[in-house]
Amino acid sequence: MRENIGVIWLREDFRLLRNYALINANKNHKKLIAVYAYKEKKFIDKKGQKWWVYKSLKNFKKDLDDYNITLQVIKTDTYKSFFEKLIKIKNISLYWNRIYEPAYLTFDKYLEKKLKFHKIDYKIFKGNVLNEFNDVKKNDNTPFKVFTPFWRVAEKIHIEKVPSPDTKI
């Protein structure tokens, strides 16, 4: 168990089961903090989304409290400014689940470079997908172009990896 603090960056994954960032941080750290970076500009014209995030965070906080994990919602203008502050805290390990939209993937690459430069431990896990992009390939190691053969292989891989439904952090 590491003495430093495990920080789980919450993005769109407010669940305990199969939340690989949360599960791995919990295995490796005595103290955990879950952080949601709230960008107010993101929700200006999206009252429904804002309501959903509020309710989801409120419910998720109750779940995290059962495991003595603190949830902090931090208001920020940009993810960059949020992480500039976070990087100044040296005694942390950062965990998050990937989001597969281009802007998020680009930011993840930027953040990885920053964290490496500042020698901050981090781990990224698959998000809300059954398989990562490169997990499912044909025998010749090239990507599938037809769905049915892809699904047969993906299903086989997924069935082998599924944890028990009663597995909790």
Give the role of each language-model region:
Residues 161-169:
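Substrate/cofactor-recognition hotspot
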Residues 1-159:
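Trp/Phe/Arg-rich N-terminal binding region typifying the photolyase-homology
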